[in-house]
Amino acid sequence: MKALRPFTLLPAVLLLTGCASLQVGSEFQSGRQAMLRGNDEAALAYFQSVAQKDPNYTYGTAYPQGILSYVGRTEYSTGKLPQARQTLERALAANRREDVARLYLGLTLVRAGDRAQGVKEIEGAMKGMYDWIEYITEAQRFSFGQFWDPGRDLRSAIQTQLAMVSGREADTPKLIAEAEWLGKRMEEEGDRARRDETTQQSRDNEGGGRSGGQ
């Protein structure tokens, strides 16, 4: 019996790799939808499964976030604070610019009793988010950047939150509520920006088609 040559196995390997990637992507989307609906236990199970299969999985292009950020955030939301801290610290070790992960690390620390360090992390995350939106809306103003926070509502909210955080006697429950709102709002903003960009592209294509036919 002749041995199979390496190149004869390549299509099968590529097929299996593609199927695995599709499965991981599908699991992630199921987890993300569960998270956005507030079903954090289900979301955590999905995210943990994705992390086991592909620990380097990243979601998003304009504002990429690693799978460890999602695992840590849902660990926080389900009250698993020690695990959330470890996971979020790992996420930041892999990418120091993941401000949503930093925000939830701060929330985790505040809830665990380390308010001073927690507030520091929350403040740093808020500044990072604000600066990123400012940068992307200017640097990519003729492309996808124009669809991020077009009315500056999110940036205005962050500025208000930063003023509250910088106060020495910031109310802890209010701080937690505002930071949790920001984490969810930042996640939703990416979806809204993508929808608006897709809608605009469809309108442009329709307009181009009508013009070409005249």
Regions found by a protein language model. Give the residues of each.
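Bacterial Sec signal peptide processing site at the extreme N-terminus
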Residues: T17-R37
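Terminal, low-structured helical/coil segments at or just beyond the last alpha-helical repeat
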Residues: W132-Q214
